[in-house]
């Protein structure tokens, strides 16, 4: 059976991603001074204005407006003619402390309060909220990610690269990408459509822009094995994209959760990542779920693997754990679930410790996806549990 599947990504200059990066830059600054900071920071960006609000409990002191401006300038909004400029935009803040009712459940999990479990203070952290988290991996790409979102991210990263290194100096920071892949019997066989929408200077023609994007962005990214003469290419299909960024669209933290994860290939529990410290299971449990899924697939236990976790606020252990191999399991699935629960500790404190999450690593995650990347900061992408998983099945 043949079918088409599409995923999108956005550049770091997209308004929603500006907001994500500001929120995570603030989180990083606080974690750098106080690794136990409790942070939940939301950002709104619009024409000439940044609004930052949230709940923070920390010993750190950071200049939030300075962090916001620095982030905006690093993204590339450096000139007033772009309609948004890190030097001149206004920055408003409204930050207060974390609710003591929430802190009550996070600081000491229900299991500790009822005497069910004895643990040190850090291991006894309760989940910062209820929620549903999914982790996924597939062997269809070296990144163990679905091909559509992988290529969409690479195109978005390439757009930023050729803008910043001067290869295409007429590009501006805002941009979006979209890739449609044709699958046959659940295997990717070709790229059906590539869509690039990129902000640009007013004096570049549509024809010249299209030619430059094909030569310097699309051709270096799309693998030859997936190209054919039927591949459709769309570049700025409206014909013009001069007004962009926060001047054209308001941006908010947490509005690109599908871009951040698996491109719509699997379900999403709804919780966003950026601006949240790792006691928030919206973030840390998603990372742990990806870590489990990637190691399971890399160990050869399944070709595709999905795990769902759910939590209750103030309770350390997950309420439920579900797995799905889509019929690709090479081992007994009941045993696989049992092995996973024995090898991996899904309590928030244990996740934070295992993945070393109390570090200022989050700004980098806030653009081009949280998964499928091999930089040092992305500890949830490590394959250091493959051997243990194999041993559990005598492989």
From Swiss-Prot:
Q: Which GO terms describe its cellular component?
A: cytosol
**Region ranges (Flexible loop):** 98-108
| Subcellular locations according to the entry | Cytoplasm
One of its GO biological process terms is: one-carbon metabolic process
The transmembrane residues are none
Class of enzymatic activity (EC top level): transferase
* Pfam families noted in UniProt: S-AdoMet_synt_C (PF02773), S-AdoMet_synt_M (PF02772), S-AdoMet_synt_N (PF00438)
Q: Does the keyword Ribosomal protein apply?
A: no
Subunit = Homotetramer; dimer of dimers.
Entry-linked HAMAP family: S_AdoMet_synth1
Question: What is the recorded name of this protein?
Answer: S-adenosylmethionine synthase
**Which organism encodes this protein?**
Thermotoga maritima (strain ATCC 43589 / DSM 3109 / JCM 10099 / NBRC 100826 / MSB8)
